[in-house]
Amino acid sequence: MLTFFRLVQYCDVQHRNIPRLRRQVPEPLLEIHPATAAAGRIQNGEWVILETATGRIRLKARYKDALHPGVVATAHGWWQGCQELGLPGYDPFGPEGANANLLVSNDVIDPISGSVPHRSQRCRVRKEGVSA
């Protein structure tokens, strides 16, 4: 199950181009329980592919013991590069990017708020380079 979180270093999708902030969280992350990662032979710090029925993105795995083993979590907003640190931007619309919005369908929308389900997406995680 996929859920989303916000990074306190950034304001929604902004400021990833600021070196002082980018040094703290330099790459898009997938937080994953170590046992879940071990089942997929995913090492801490490796690039992974996160897929839902709607799309896929590329993220760096970061172990987090506090997560339930059946849950992974990521933050949205990765597209800006940070030229001063030599860190790339990410294609906001392609499968090699890190745009978490690509993982969420607009088919189910809350009738009152218009919000999409950012807290409950079925997903699959695999090590980059391993066939689906």
Regions found by a protein language model. Name each.
Residues 15-132:
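Long, contiguous, secondary-structure-rich segments that constitute the structural scaffold
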Residues 1-18:
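Long, low-complexity segments enriched in small/aliphatic residues
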